[in-house]
Amino acid sequence: MKISRETLHQLIENKLCQAGLKREHAATVAEVLVYADARGIHSHGAVRVEYYAERISKGGTNREPEFRLEETGPCSAILHADNAAGQVAAKMGMEHAIKTAQQNGVAVVGISRMGHSGAISYFVQQAARAGFIGISMCQSDPMVVPFGGAEIYYGTNPLAFAAPGEGDEILTFDMATTVQAWGKVLDARSRNMSIPDTWAVDKNGVPTTDPFAVHALLPAAGPKGYGLMMMIDVLSGVLLGLPFGRQVSSMYDDLHAGRNLGQLHIVINPNFFSSSELFRQHLSQTMRELNAITPAPGFNQVYYPGQDQDIKQRKAAVEGIEIVDDIYQYLISDALYNTSYETKNPFAQ
């Protein structure tokens, strides 16, 4: 079924307020979740609300966080987030990074002790809309076997990039360092769909197409994805003095406790390196040139990275956002959550 962006936003905001989140924070979380669903990233959209509601109600997301911004240098800062909702902390951290890059050319802002922040391309697009290049990366729960390994160590550790072209054009790239994000498995479960056998393995280490049999995810491109998830764990965890590797808290372990996750934003002001106008012209030229490339057999069009999601977002603004009926029924119900996510086992979800 499809519903309007405004309706979905209000339903999510109301449910999070029902769980105990203050209206201002609930609106920010809803904004990021609706953004994800509008772009077809359903793994990070409304499917997450029930889990968030349970964690908020149990105190694992701080309903009254005391944020503290520590400016550690002219271009660097740490936002101590007090286990606030991740979307709220990440948006706040990016706002400070943008102000710093405006004045000093570059900014690096670490966000310390936060909750799950969702689709992190939202935050790099904040920077792009301000005319800057945005890069963001964050930790996630351990659920990935390292290349050549049989035991879980790292999380899906996503990485996102966005840069402004001419007008309102934005080039956006957002990826998990696994073949697919864990949320894609959750989305497949909610839709009763199978998954490709390249995404994950079962408890015996055998590739599986059954999303309910998943025991661990696989790194993207083998050793390359493995290396990237290591880098992100170092920059968003080790660098900030936070838990790292398999020490990172599980999303489903103790919903009464804060996640203590880390995220790192990097913002670059093109004016300090060439000129903003020239940069934007060349970026739009890149996008046009990629679109003009002759497609390979089996393809109708060459897209620049993120273009397929841009198209979905524009379409959703006109036609509404696709949402699974079970999720819609939950959002309009009085229930805070139907089944507890506190299983201590992410693969039981």
Swiss-Prot record:
| Outcome recorded upon mutating Y52F | 2- and 16-fold decrease of the affinity for NAD and (S)-ureidoglycolate, respectively. Strong decrease of the catalytic efficiency
Question: Where is the site labelled Plays a crucial role in stabilizing the binding of (S)-ureidoglycolate?
Answer: R48
Disulfide pairings: none
- Judging by the UniProt lineage, the source's domain of life is Bacteria
* EC class name: oxidoreductase
Molecular function terms from GO: ureidoglycolate dehydrogenase activity
Can you cite a GO biological process for this protein? allantoin assimilation pathway
- Record note on what altering D141N does: 6-fold decrease of the affinity for (S)-ureidoglycolate, but same affinity for NAD compared to the wild-type. Strong decrease of the catalytic efficiency
Reported effect of changing D141A?
5-fold decrease of the affinity for (S)-ureidoglycolate, but same affinity for NAD compared to the wild-type. Strong decrease of the catalytic efficiency
Q: What is the effect of changing M251A?
A: 2- and 13-fold decrease of the affinity for NAD and (S)-ureidoglycolate, respectively. Slight decrease of the catalytic efficiency
Q: Which InterPro entries match?
A: Mal/L-sulf/L-lact_DH-like_ah (IPR043144), Mal/L-sulf/L-lact_DH-like_NADP (IPR043143), Mal/L-sulfo/L-lacto_DH-like_sf (IPR036111), Malate/L-lactate_DH-like (IPR003767), Ureidoglycolate_dehydrogenase (IPR017590)
Assembly = Homodimer.
Question: Would you identify the family this protein belongs to, as annotated?
Answer: Belongs to the LDH2/MDH2 oxidoreductase family.
The protein's name in its UniProt record: Ureidoglycolate dehydrogenase (NAD(+))
The organism is Escherichia coli (strain K12)
